[in-house]
């Protein structure tokens, strides 16, 4: 994937995740690798972690998702 495309896609995914989760993922980082998207960040709910992953899966169904979002106590 070309760099400008990856950057644009990262921004689109970030906006989608923020909208779907109500901005409940802190320090969100998205890394796009060949055939896999890596998510990193922090949230207080397993549900929010899964919502973030679902956003990526819907947008990029052929990509795997490595969900490194950490669930922490609030």
Named regions from a protein language model:
Residues 1-74:
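N-terminal targeting leaders
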